[in-house]
Amino acid sequence: MSTVCHNCRHPEFLGVECAWPAPGCSATAAPRRRPVVSWLVRTVAAASLLVALLQFGQAGYIQAKAWLAQALIAQAWQKTLAGQTQVKPWPWADTWPVARLRVPSRGVELYVLAGSEGRSLAFGPGHVFGTAQPGAAGNSVIGGHRDTHFAFLQWVQAGETVEVEMPTGAVAVYRISDQRVVDKSDTGVMASPPDSHRLTLVTCYPFDALRAGGPLRYVVTAEEAGTPL
């Protein structure tokens, strides 16, 4: 409810002194703090927007770097197919392509790098040292980032095929048999059963996590589907 100040004829709320006293008004003006509150709101909003833009810019830079690197790695892979070995995609690189990975049903084509260290994974999926070479007998384990090259793993289904092109040009065909979430300490992911021809793709989980890393991994297992092409 509101009344009208009898002295200055400005509206006032019951129990609140007149905020716009006219000359001669007996009411005492109440301090106006609305501008301070508005300034705080604007400042917080601007800061939030700045943080969001910085995060978006960083994410865009990571995405651009990841896919630009794949274009350079593709050139190195062509030289590898021509008979060269350990062809670095750029002079200062400490890795090189060891396979080409394709998932026809998803339109995915990626070049796999030697090693699964963080520096390598920034540019492409990486083959884990100590496991079978991609396309060879045993269990070949390949890791990749959930928000760039291996983001597609969240959509693949059992029965889809994965093709691995080797440096010789031969292609091994695998069929996805299993998807599961494990703890990152689960070494069974790299186990190689006798007479196995397995491809294991690993990335961080969950896919929508705000921070990289974490204790969980998403594992896609594929078994050889037939004779290499």
Name what the model sees in each region.
Residues 39-229:
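Solvent-exposed, non-transmembrane regions of membrane-associated and secreted proteins
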Residues 5-25:
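Cysteine-cluster motifs in flexible loop/terminal segments that predominantly coordinate metals
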Residues 2, 15, 198:
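Residues immediately within or flanking Cys/His clusters that coordinate Zn2+
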